[in-house]
Amino acid sequence: MTLQHHDHQHDKACAGQCIFDTDLHHFERDVIEASHKQLVMVDLWADWCGPCHFLTPVLLRVIPTYDGKVRLAKVEVDEGDNMKIAGKYGARGFPTVLLFKNGEEVARFHSAKPEHFVREFIDEHLD
């Protein structure tokens, strides 16, 4: 269940780039460096994970409404070396969602959450 940039072309404020896949080799650029310009939410997920499939549509609805102030990096932990990202950040279960600002993790949540929770989670960290 890999997301492609073109799946989100309807999102004009983000020019289709607010929601994207990343991996271990691009994490520094896509998340850490990018978080100096805007919030970057990282969804650590797995295809076999039921709660991950519940959370994904919630995130896909919420992120585009922030007009480019928040980006969502999707990391499928079972692809390549991506589990190393989960290990580095101590993710014990999936989904785990991390929020980065100014190059640092500032918050996280675990498991599937409703839309209002995700909005409050983001709003707490917007400038």
What do these predicted ranges mean?
Residues 43-45, 99:
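Structural cue for short, hydrophobic secondary-structure segments
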Residues 92-127:
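Non-catalytic, surface beta->alpha helical segment in thiol-disulfide oxidoreductase systems
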Residues 53-55, 89:
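Detector for the c-type heme attachment site
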Residues 49-52, 97:
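The canonical Cys-X-X-Cys-His
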Residues 20-40:
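A short beta-strand-turn-helix
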Residues 20-22, 44, 55-83:
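Thiol-based oxidoreductase modules, predominantly thioredoxin-like and allied folds used
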Residues 38, 45-48, 93:
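Short pre-active-site segment immediately N-terminal to redox-active cysteine/selenocysteine motifs
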Residues 1-21, 127:
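N-terminal targeting signals for export/organelle localization
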